[in-house]
């Protein structure tokens, strides 16, 4: 019997994602000016207000007000009617120095003995369901909102009423063998201007007219654009039987941090695999790579993706766990969901993984180049499944004599640079 599976995504203007992006922008500023910075930065955003808190150990001085306002402007909160606007919002900082107790437990004279920044378990997942080895429902949910943001920023005349806050959700029907049959449901909720006024008509009639226009544009503009981005096998899943729920609660004018308070780290499933695989519970944004919540989750994704790409299995979950202050992981666990292509148990695969990939925190940092300012781009539309690329980033501040220019590689954990090593190790 067929079954349904659903994943959601949220836009860069969603309150929790605004908070994530501010936290990661601050992290990037610290790392650009001091690669050894230890950062744990949390952000709260609400009506007209940004609150920053956390612990930092760094030689750099960062203008946190300026960084926060630049992020808010970049997202698109630039109008006073939003009641959360880049120039006028208050920015309060309660960032203070990192605990000496924690720092002593993490830093070592031998960098490869560097202990994990905290205890916990982290997961990586990959599937051959899509070209980027991500679950299809989540990939589609991200794509819908990426395209919606591109329209809002680059082609505003097409859907001129769009505001920054939005959410998506995609449900896919699968057969008994886990093969996608068709897209069952698409949900889009997008914040919008009040672009039809109740002049000569009732407010209810005006609201209904706005909703009909948005639904029409989603079906005839947004979805066809997203469909065209995918290969033929995925395009075939878009049929006339898709159920659409567009702004199902009706008018969505009040949104963003004015509509809902946002906090760093509240969209961890959107950030990872959309409910597929597993999650250890630790958020990513605002944390430097000494925090294994982040770095080990990236490393586990890197392992899972390279294993699936090498043909070890069609679907893989990798778990790694740490104790604070201890470099060597407590365990490496692998689950192939019965879809392994090698004559080995999952335990034997896990043992082999430990031989191929050094999972000590310092080794992860160096292998994936995580001491660079690469994190702002991860803070919206998913940390996983993205395209590795080299970009030039420029950091300006009134507190430094000249701009800091960095050529950095984004999403290094998505590289398929270990496929040959994996194939050799598994005899593939």
Residue ranges and their predicted role:
Residues 46, 313-315, 322-428:
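Internal helix-turn-beta structural module
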Residues 6, 66, 73-254, 380, ...:
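Glycine-rich, mobile lid/loop segments that gate access to catalytic sites or pores
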Residues 39-41, 166-172, 242-246, 312-323:
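A short glycine-rich, hydrophobically flanked beta-strand micro-motif that places a catalytic Asp/Glu
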Residues 268, 273-317, 328-335:
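C-terminal catalytic subdomain
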Residues 40-58, 324-328:
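Short, charge-patterned binding micro-sites
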Residues 8-10, 14-19, 115-130, 253-278, ...:
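Conserved phosphate/anionic-ligand binding catalytic regions in large, soluble enzymes, centered on
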Residues 12-31, 126-150, 287-311:
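Alpha-helical support elements that line or immediately flank enzyme active sites
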Residues 1-40, 419, 425-428:
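N-terminal, positively charged regions that mediate nucleic acid binding
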């Amino acid at each position: 019997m067929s079954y349904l599976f659903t994943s959601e995504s949220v836009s860069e203007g969603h309150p929790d994602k605004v908070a994530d992006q501010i936290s990661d922008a601050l992290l990037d500023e610290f790392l650009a000016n001091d690669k050894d910075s230890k950062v744990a930065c949390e952000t709260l955003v609400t009506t007209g207000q940004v609150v920053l808190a956390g612990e930092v150990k760094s030689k750099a001085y960062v203008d946190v007000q300026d960084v926060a306002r630049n992020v808010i402007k970049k997202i698109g909160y630039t109008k006073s009617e939003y009641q959360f606007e880049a120039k006028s919002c208050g920015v309060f900082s309660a960032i203070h120095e990192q605990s000496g107790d924690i720092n002593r437990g993490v830093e070592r004279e031998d960098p490869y003995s560097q202990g994990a920044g905290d205890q916990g378990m982290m997961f990586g997942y990959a599937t051959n369901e899509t070209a980027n080895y991500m679950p299809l429902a989540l990939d589609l949910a991200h794509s819908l909102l990426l395209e919606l943001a591109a329209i809002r920023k680059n082609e505003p005349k097409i859907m001129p009423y769009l505001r920054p806050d939005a959410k998506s959700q995609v449900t896919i029907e699968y057969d008994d063998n886990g093969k996608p049959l068709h897209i069952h449901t698409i949900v889009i909720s997008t914040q919008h201007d009040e672009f039809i006024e109740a002049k000569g008509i009732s407010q209810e009639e005006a609201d209904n007219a706005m909703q009909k226009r948005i639904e029409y544009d989603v079906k005839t503009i947004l979805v066809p654009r997203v469909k065209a981005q995918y290969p033929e096998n995925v395009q075939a899943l878009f049929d006339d039987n898709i159920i659409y729920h567009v702004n199902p609660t009706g008018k969505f004018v009040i949104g963003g941090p004015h509509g809902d308070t946002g906090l760093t780290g509240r969209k961890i499933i959107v950030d990872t695999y959309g409910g597929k695989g597993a999650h250890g519970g630790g958020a990513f944004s605002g944390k430097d790579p000494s925090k294994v919540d982040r770095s080990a989750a990236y490393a586990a994704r890197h392992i899972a993706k390279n294993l699936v790409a090498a043909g070890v299995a069609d679907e893989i979950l990798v778990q790694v766990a740490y104790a604070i202050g201890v470099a060597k992981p407590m365990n490496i666990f692998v689950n192939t969901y019965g879809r392994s292509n090698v004559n080995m148990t999952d335990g034997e695969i896990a043992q082999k993984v430990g031989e191929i990939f050094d999972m000590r925190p310092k080794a992860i940092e160096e292998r994936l180049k995580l001491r660079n300012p690469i994190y702002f781009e991860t803070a919206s539309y998913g940390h996983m499944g993205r395209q590795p690329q080299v970009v030039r980033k420029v950091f300006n501040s009134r507190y430094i004599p000249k701009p800091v220019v960095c050529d950095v590689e984004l999403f290094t954990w998505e590289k398929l640079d270990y496929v040959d090593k994996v194939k050799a190790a598994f005899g593939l």
